[in-house]
Amino acid sequence: YQLKGGQVDYGKNHSKKYSIIQKPKNKNYKGLYPQWDASNPIHLIGHSMGGQTARMLDYLLTQNIYENEDLLEDSKLLGGVTNHAILSITSISTPHNGTTLAEIVRKTIPFIQYFVGIAGVVGTDFYSFDLEQWGFRRMLKESWADYISRMRNHKAWSTKNISSWDLSLSGAEEINSFLQISPNIYYFSIITSTTIKKEGSSQHVPSKGTSII
């Protein structure tokens, strides 16, 4: 929707299944490239999970998504098929087969509170987690502490409708089971490394200054 423009729509069936907001009011975009279609195809480049996202976007564009067994979703993206809109997908440092780090990150969500504390001091909305569909939006006059407490205890973290699941080993395996390679798209995958080999050993350790995420 950020590319083409329009109101984000998570689909009636999907929204009902996970009890999320189907059309978050603050996710309506003008579009970076409104003319995007089969006559004006694009190249997608995704870093980290962005590689998975690009592949999923192709799936949503080229498959009919149903509201129920008989009725298509009432959405241009979900209820119709758009082929040949993507020329290539390039992923950079994307864990297409999942990463064990996903479980570590999920369990250390409370660590975010430290950063949000800073955000509270400087009075910024930078740490909006862009999860309005789950209700992860700071309410009027809600303190940062209350906001984080509400977020940490949300049921979203235990569902498959969250990034930590998609990036996990099991989640990536499930995604790969239905995201098929398209004969109309060129695929490129660029790998990276931030480790160095220990002298006199076969072990590799993180390079100095490497971030955990």
Where are these regions (language model features)?
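Active-site catalytic motif of lipid deacylating hydrolases and related acyltransferases
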Residues: 1-42
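Long, hydrophobic/aromatic-enriched structural stretches that serve as scaffold segments
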Residues: 39, 53-60
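Short beta-strand immediately N-terminal to the catalytic nucleophile in serine-hydrolase-like folds
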Residues: 44-46, 92
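Gly/Ala-rich beta-loop-alpha elbow adjacent to hydrolase catalytic centers
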Residues: 46-50, 54
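Helical cap/lid subdomain of alpha/beta-hydrolase-fold lipid enzymes
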Residues: 59-213
